Amino acid sequence: QMDNRTPEKVKFLWEAGFRQVVLARELSIREIRKIHEICPEVPLEVFVHGALCVSYSGQCYVSQACFGRSANRGECAQFCRLPFSLVDSEGKVIVKDKHLLSLKDMNQSDELERLLDAGASSFKIEGRLKDVSYVKNVTAAYRQKLDAIFARRPEYVRASSGTCRFDFKPQLDKSFSRGFTHYFLHGRSEDIFSFDTPKSLGEEMGTMKEARGNFLTVAGLKSFNNGDGVCYIDEQGRLQGFRINRVDGNKLYPQEMPRIKPRTK
């Protein structure tokens, strides 16, 4: 991670012999376009999906300083995913035990055409320590979106050959994520953090209406299935979860009844 944020640095790398430059995750689409306009001969690779670093790409040394594990050598200890308390100058606790530095995951799947038009020539999916199902689902989702763009825009040509066929419907919210954000692509925004948990939340399924006996009644946005695992944030702001043994309409019969309040999502 070389923190490639400026046209000057990209131009220097090109003149030094590099033939493709990976841009930093923190750039806006306007900044990407500016780099391409100043350095049109340089193929630019842009991050589009996966985990985000709360520091500038390649400029965080907390993991090395605290744990002796270099983030720039693929050994980040993920210090920014730990819980922290925010205390003011008088010792008053403003926030207690929240994941104040934990960012959501990047998802630019609906911005690919704009990124191509801005000058991106390839896309990068962050996948350190991800499993096979994550790789399969996420790459399939982006492959289909790119193929749809290429079908409409003949001026864009694939660098690879061959075709991909899928026997499933890729869904990005089915794979690990801390929630999604466009990050700084359209400028600074507030909704980029996942304060409650650094773990995967999955897709929103509905709201709990009531608990009675051995079942929960849910106002569902989507259907549940026997054996599903579900999670929720409890009153203390902690991530909890349980497994569903049986589903009967909007009634869920858990393996073990959780302590969950009505109106919990």
Give each language-model segment a name.
Residues 8-265:
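Surface-exposed amphipathic alpha-helical tracts and adjacent flexible/coil segments at the periphery
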Residues 2-7:
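Gly/Gly-Pro- and Ser/Thr-rich, intrinsically disordered tail segments characteristic of DNA damage-repair
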